[in-house]
Design a protein with these regions (language model features):
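Active-site loop signature of alpha/beta-hydrolase-fold enzymes
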Residues: 38-39, 65, 142
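Serine-hydrolase catalytic core
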Residues: 157-160
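Short beta-strand element of the alpha/beta-hydrolase
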Residues: 25-35
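N-terminal cap/lid segment of alpha/beta-hydrolase-fold proteins
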Residues: 1-24
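The serine-hydrolase catalytic nucleophile loop
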Residues: 36-48
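Conserved alpha/beta-hydrolase
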Residues: 49-73
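Primarily recognizes the serine-hydrolase "nucleophile elbow" in alpha/beta-hydrolase
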Residues: 94-154
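Alpha/beta-hydrolase active-site loop
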Residues: 78-102
């Protein structure tokens, strides 16, 4: 059995999952990021599986996604890279809030994600050497080359 709940952490809504009866006990902790145009709820099956394995999982919504989505789909498609960079910037406060609650056992904090979330995990890794582990599923660390092709020209502006 697990606990799966929405909490406010570091000024934002996160999905929090952990084994039952361990809500306030230190555990190995994973911050998991979702993919572009998705949300923490769509990726919640990762939180469930990891909590069942004994981890604490924190899943934030990226800017303009999930609970933070404000309805501008066309605009969001133009802002992939700023959203990714904001994920990086927000991690420091999120990590501090998780640590401040005493939720991390023995400094065992990892970051993971899928697609844009995997790219987020890789970017965070470059500035947080204290992380114990990083997992990138279906993402890429080739930011410089991707910036030349990924979301450079949105599909609705291209001619056939």
């Amino acid at each position: 059995m697990i606990v799966l709940e929405v909490r406010n952490l570091a000024g934002g809504e996160v999905l929090h999952a952990c084994p039952q009866n361990a809500s306030d006990r230190p555990l190995p902790c994973i911050v998991f990021y979702h993919g572009f145009t998705s949300s923490k709820l769509v990726y919640s099956y990762f939180a469930v599986a990891l909590a069942e394995a004994g981890f604490r999982v924190i899943m934030p919504d990226a800017p303009e996604h999930g609970a933070r989505y404000f309805g501008d789909e066309k605009g969001r498609m133009q802002r992939f890279w700023p959203i990714l960079l904001q994920n990086f910037a927000e991690f420091t406060a999120l990590r501090a809030a998780i640590a401040g609650r005493g939720w991390i056992a023995d400094d065992r904090l990892a970051v993971a994600g899928a697609s844009m979330g995997g790219m987020t995990a890789l970017g965070i890794m470059t500035h947080h050497p204290q992380l114990k582990s990083v997992a990138c599923l279906m993402g890429s660390g080739y930011f410089s080359s991707l910036a030349q092709s990924l979301f450079l020209h949105p599909p609705w502006t291209r001619s056939s």
